[in-house]
């Protein structure tokens, strides 16, 4: 981090010459995002003193000491806005974070047992978030690590590229559901915990706990398990509350500097919307591809206007169904809003935008298996409207083979100097059942270069070892 810097320049003028002293003291405070502003506060003192001189009766010398303080005042960092995506036409394998390849380590170097990983980025860094069970592998606390909700779960993070071990991880708050985002100046962290019938959303801005939001349907209030989205200092968070096998209506919270300033109630097809993966289609619109856990294998698709703070939900019309389990592609008949069959159950899906000057690309991920959380493929559709376009999405490569686990997936964008890099992350779960540890690796694919997606990802973990 870079600083407010104070420089004091003292110039002593004497009859015999010039003595220049420069005193510099610097302290680091925050990141410099634009040119330094200068402010001068002059201090002038002019004492008179008599100098020894051979002919003192005829000469009087005056020493004038002039002091000028120059104070460098740094501006606050700027709010972030979505930019055009960096150039590229395909995604490639960028990174694998497979903590349990280091499972022989003990103590502070032991990998944490985690699930629901996601990544969020600020102007200068990305953080890898997850929900831990407050246990490590190896260890003696494996019981309960397959549970979604309990009193031990916490939202943690490491710098992207670090392994989430005991010593590397920052524990942000108690939470069994989470999100986070950076507004350009500071991190906003979201955690949900509490009893199923009365869960609570907690907000942390930087190091301060700033606000809460209470359950409105008394049925597992929860959030998106991926990054929230910020523009001009306003951050938008998707939440939902309701039955996993019935009605669960979502809302959006508009948050500024850690405090809720508005609730947004979507209209349209609102029966069940959860675990949305959201991003900016433009400076005006946030779009989200979500999960319906009860009625359909199509993804509910949200459009949120950040100028009017209004949101509408409809089902995606494409014949490429993105949830798991799902029926055969193209088998659902009727209008776009038809639910079809095999709608029970679901999975969070990856979604990210490629913003270009003349068009927009929407990239999605789905499991290779129609019935199991195995494998992960990448798809893309340029331009058009997800609410009305019934065409199939174009397959763009295999990120995880059908022999490997492919659970939740999510989107995020890395900030380059002049553009944003779209990426998709995949949760690869080591499912040991209820008798042993249950944790995850994270595979990351990002837009870079041209050609075809070349290689899939494996975790390299054998739970029997």
Swiss-Prot record:
Assembly description: Homotetramer.
Region spans: Involved in apical transport and lipid raft association: 13-35
CDD domains for the chain: Influenza_NA
Note: The influenza B genome consist of 8 RNA segments. Genetic variation of hemagglutinin and/or neuraminidase genes results in the emergence of new influenza strains. The mechanism of variation can be the result of point mutations or the result of genetic reassortment between segments of two different strains.
HAMAP family: INFV_NRAM (MF_04071)
Lineage of the species this protein comes from: Viruses, Riboviria, Orthornavirae, Negarnaviricota, Polyploviricotina
Residues on Virion surface side: 35-465
Places the protein is found: Virion membrane; Host apical cell membrane
Any single GO BP term: viral budding from plasma membrane
GO molecular function per UniProt: exo-alpha-sialidase activity; metal ion binding
Function: Catalyzes the removal of terminal sialic acid residues from viral and cellular glycoconjugates. Cleaves off the terminal sialic acids on the glycosylated HA during virus budding to facilitate virus release. Additionally helps virus spread through the circulation by further removing sialic acids from the cell surface. These cleavages prevent self-aggregation and ensure the efficient spread of the progeny virus from cell to cell. Otherwise, infection would be limited to one round of replication.
Region of interest called Hypervariable stalk region, as start-end residue ranges on this chain: 38-85
Binding residue positions for substrate: 115, 149, 274-275, 291, 373
UniProt membrane topology term: Single-pass type II membrane protein
UniProt-annotated catalytic positions: 148 (proton donor/acceptor), 408 (nucleophile)
Residues carrying a glycan: 55, 63, 143, 283, 294
Name of the protein this chain belongs to: Neuraminidase
One Pfam family cited in the UniProt record for this chain: Neur
PTM characteristics: N-glycosylated.
Activity regulation summary: Inhibited by the neuraminidase inhibitors zanamivir (Relenza) and oseltamivir (Tamiflu). These drugs interfere with the release of progeny virus from infected cells and are effective against all influenza strains. Resistance to neuraminidase inhibitors is quite rare.
EC number(s) on file: 3.2.1.18
Domain free text: Intact N-terminus is essential for virion morphogenesis. Possesses two apical sorting signals, one in the ectodomain, which is likely to be a glycan, and the other in the transmembrane domain. The transmembrane domain also plays a role in lipid raft association.
Chain sites annotated for binding Ca(2+): 292, 323
Organism name: Influenza B virus (strain B/Memphis/6/1986)
Ranges that cross the membrane: 12-34
Alphabetically ordered keywords of this record: Calcium, Disulfide bond, Glycoprotein, Glycosidase, Host cell membrane, Host membrane, Hydrolase, Membrane, Metal-binding, Signal-anchor, Transmembrane, Transmembrane helix, Virion
Renumbered residue ranges of the record's region Head of neuraminidase: 88-465
Annotated gene: NA
């Amino acid at each position: 981090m870079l600083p407010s810097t104070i420089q004091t320049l003292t110039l002593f003028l004497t009859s015999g010459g010039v003595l220049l002293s420069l005193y510099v003291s610097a302290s680091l405070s925050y990141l410099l995002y634009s040119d330094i502003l200068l402010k001068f506060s002059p201090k002038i003192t002019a004492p008179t003193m008599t100098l020894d001189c051979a002919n003192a009766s005829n000469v009087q010398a005056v020493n004038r000491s002039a002091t000028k303080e120059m104070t460098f005042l740094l501006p606050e960092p700027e709010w972030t806005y979505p930019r055009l995506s960096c150039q590229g036409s395909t995604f490639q394998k960028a990174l694998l974070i497979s903590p349990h390849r280091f499972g022989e380590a003990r103590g502070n170097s032991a990998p944490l047992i985690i699930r629901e990983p996601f990544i969020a980025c600020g102007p200068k860094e990305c953080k890898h978030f997850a929900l831990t069970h407050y246990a490590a592998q190896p260890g003696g606390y494996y019981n309960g690590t397959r549970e979604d909700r309990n009193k031990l779960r916490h939202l943690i993070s490491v710098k992207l590229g670090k392994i989430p071990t005991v010593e590397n991880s920052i524990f942000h708050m108690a939470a069994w559901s989470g999100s986070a985002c950076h507004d350009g100046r500071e991190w906003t962290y979201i955690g949900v915990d509490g009893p199923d019938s009365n869960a609570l959303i907690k907000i942390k801005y930087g190091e301060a706990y700033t606000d809460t939001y209470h359950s409105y349907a008394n049925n597992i209030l929860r959030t998106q398990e991926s990054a929230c989205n910020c523009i001009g200092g306003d951050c938008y968070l998707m939440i939902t509350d309701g039955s996993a096998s019935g009605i669960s209506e979502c809302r959006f919270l508009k948050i500024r500097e850690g405090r809720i300033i508005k609730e947004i109630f979507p209209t349209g097809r609102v029966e069940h919307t959860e675990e949305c993966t959201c991003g900016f289609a433009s400076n005006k619109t946030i779009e989200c591809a979500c999960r319906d856990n009860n009625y359909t294998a199509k993804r509910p698709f949200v459009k949120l206007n950040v100028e009017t703070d209004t949101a509408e939900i409809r089902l995606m019309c494409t014949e490429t169904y993105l949830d798991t389990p799902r029926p055969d592609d193209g088998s659902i008949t009727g209008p776009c809003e038809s639910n079809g069959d095999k709608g029970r159950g679901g999975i969070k899906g990856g979604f990210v935008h490629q913003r270009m000057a003349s068009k927009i690309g929407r990239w999605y991920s789905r499991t290779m298996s129609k019935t199991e959380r195995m494998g992960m493929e990448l798809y893309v559709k340029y331009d058009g409207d997800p609410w009305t376009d019934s065409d199939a999405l174009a397959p763009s490569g295999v990120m995880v083979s059908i022999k490997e686990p492919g659970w939740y997936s999510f989107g995020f964008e890395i900030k380059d100097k002049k553009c944003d890099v779209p990426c998709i992350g995949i949760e690869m779960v080591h499912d040991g059942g209820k008798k042993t540890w249950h944790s995850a690796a994270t595979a990351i694919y990002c837009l870079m270069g041209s050609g075809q997606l070349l290689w899939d990802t494996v975790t390299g973990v054998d739970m029997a070892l």
